[in-house]
Every structure is written in structure tokens, then in C-alpha cells.
């Protein structure tokens, strides 16, 4: 329970129903019945709304062509992981199999905010203000800097073209999970080098696989 209290202190919110917080932090490998997946489904919508609302309010350019790449970054696993670091969220996740990766941290981050929303009596305004209290400055900084998601597939292709004058290949390995929460696993390969990436879409999984292959190629130099 002390661990939960530490997280509550970082959040600035004390849960009335501690089991909600525990559920938000629990991976399906730890508990088949009480895990975060349904909360993550709700939290995805909540967090996306909070962030996109700020983006539309504070962006210096309101054109869709400018907003879309910013939005893609701001609601990405990469950015959610940066925000989650402020809470040291990885320390509180309960998991039995596998390692805690960016996908799991991103999912738990979303589930956590759904748990706050439900525990507060489904008070969206309260939840949004708490979220902004913690993360508004980080979001506004990203908007001001015009941060966009890195295109790892393009970066990888530039590396392989330069080294071998060849393009990497991508292969869909599997699609897992229910319809509302599919997980795509993709293999990226060039010569004898192969890596896997996973994501909520094939495109995202390809980007993750490309990122891992870049790391592998850098290590092999």
C-alpha cells in the first residue's frame, strides 16, 4: 500500500477506491481478471481529448496540415512515456511475464487517468485540471517547439542505402488482441539483421521495428 501512496503523492490525488488504482497498474499477465485494459480503452479517449484541446487552443497555426503531425506526436507512446517519467510510473506497474516496455507504460498512463476520472465521480473537469496541473507546461513546450514524431523508417532506409544500397524489408508477424485493442507485431530486416516491433497499428509497429533495427545496426558498427 505504501507504493500506492507514493504514486498518489506524485499525482496529487488520493483515491477513494484503491482497487481502481491497483487495476490501472496491473498487466494482464499479473491478473487475468483485474487488469488495466478496459481502463486504458477509456483513458485513451480522455487523454487524447485533454491534449488535443490544448493543441487547438495554443497552436500558433490552426491549419490541419500543421496540427496533424503535432497531434500525432502529442498522443504517441513516445510522448506519453516522457510524461509518465514525471510520475516514475514504471516503478508501480505490476507484471509477471515480459519486461515493462514503452507500450505498457503508455497503456498504464492512459489507464491511470481513466481511474482518476471514475474515482472522482466521473468528473471530467476535475480530471482535466489535475492532468493540466501536472503536464500542461510539458505539452505547451512541445507545441511551441513544433515537435513531431521521428520517422524511423526513413532514417533506417537512409542508413541501409548508404551502407548496402538496399532497402529494409518489413513483414507482419502477427495481430493479437480483441478488436478494440489489437497489437501488431512486425519484423524489420536487412541482410542478417532482424528486429521486431509492436504497436497499436501496423504502421506504428513498423516504426518501432525500424527504431530497433537502427539501434542494432549502430551497435554492429
Curated annotation (Swiss-Prot):
Homodimer. The gene is rnc. CDD domains: DSRM_RNAse_III_family, RIBOc. Optimum pH is 8-9. Mg(2+) binds at residues 40, 107, 110. Changing residue 44 to N: Very low catalytic activity, binds RNA normally. Gene3D superfamilies: 3.30.160.20, Ribonuclease III domain. Keywords: Cytoplasm, Endonuclease, Hydrolase, Magnesium, Metal-binding, mRNA processing, Nuclease, RNA-binding, rRNA processing, tRNA processing. This is Ribonuclease 3. It is found in: Cytoplasm. GO terms for biological process: mRNA processing; regulation of gene expression; RNA processing; rRNA processing; tRNA processing. It is an enzyme of class 3 (hydrolase). Residues 4-121 form the RNase III domain. Digests double-stranded RNA. Involved in the processing of primary rRNA transcript to yield the immediate precursors to the large and small rRNAs (23S and 16S). Also processes some mRNAs, and tRNAs when they are encoded in the rRNA operon. Probably processes pre-crRNA and tracrRNA of type II CRISPR loci if present in the organism. GO terms for molecular function: double-stranded RNA binding; identical protein binding; metal ion binding; ribonuclease III activity. InterPro entries: dsRBD_dom, RNase_III, RNase_III_dom, RNase_III_sf. Its cofactor is Mg(2+). Belongs to the ribonuclease III family. The keyword Nuclease applies. Binds 2 Mg(2+) per subunit. Mn(2+) also supports catalytic activity.
Amino acid at each position: 500500500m505504501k507504493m500506492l501512496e507514493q504514486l498518489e503523492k506524485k499525482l496529487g490525488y488520493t483515491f477513494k477506491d484503491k482497487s481502481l488504482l491497483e487495476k490501472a497498474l496491473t498487466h494482464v499477465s499479473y491478473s487475468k481478471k483485474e487488469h488495466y485494459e478496459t481502463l486504458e480503452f477509456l483513458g485513451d479517449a480522455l487523454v487524447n481529448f485533454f491534449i488535443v484541446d490544448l493543441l487547438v487552443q495554443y497552436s500558433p497555426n490552426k491549419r490541419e496540415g500543421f496540427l496533424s503531425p503535432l497531434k500525432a506526436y502529442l498522443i504517441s507512446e513516445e510522448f506519453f512515456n516522457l510524461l509518465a517519467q514525471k510520475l516514475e510510473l514504471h516503478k508501480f506497474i505490476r507484471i509477471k511475464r515480459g519486461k515493462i516496455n514503452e507500450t505498457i507504460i503508455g497503456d498504464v498512463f492512459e489507464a491511470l487517468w481513466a481511474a482518476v476520472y471514475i474515482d472522482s465521480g466521473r468528473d471530467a473537469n476535475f480530471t482535466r485540471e489535475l492532468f493540466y496541473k501536472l503536464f500542461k507546461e510539458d505539452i505547451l513546450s512541445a507545441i511551441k517547439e513544433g515537435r513531431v514524431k521521428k520517422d524511423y523508417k526513413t532514417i533506417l532506409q537512409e542508413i541501409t542505402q548508404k551502407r548496402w544500397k538496399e532497402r529494409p524489408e518489413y513483414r507482419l508477424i502477427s495481430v493479437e488482441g480483441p478488436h478494440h485493442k489489437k497489437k501488431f507485431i512486425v519484423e524489420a530486416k536487412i541482410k542478417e539483421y532482424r528486429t521486431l516491433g509492436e504497436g497499436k497499428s501496423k504502421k506504428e509497429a513498423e516504426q518501432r521495428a525500424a527504431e530497433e533495427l537502427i539501434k542494432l545496426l549502430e551497435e554492429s558498427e
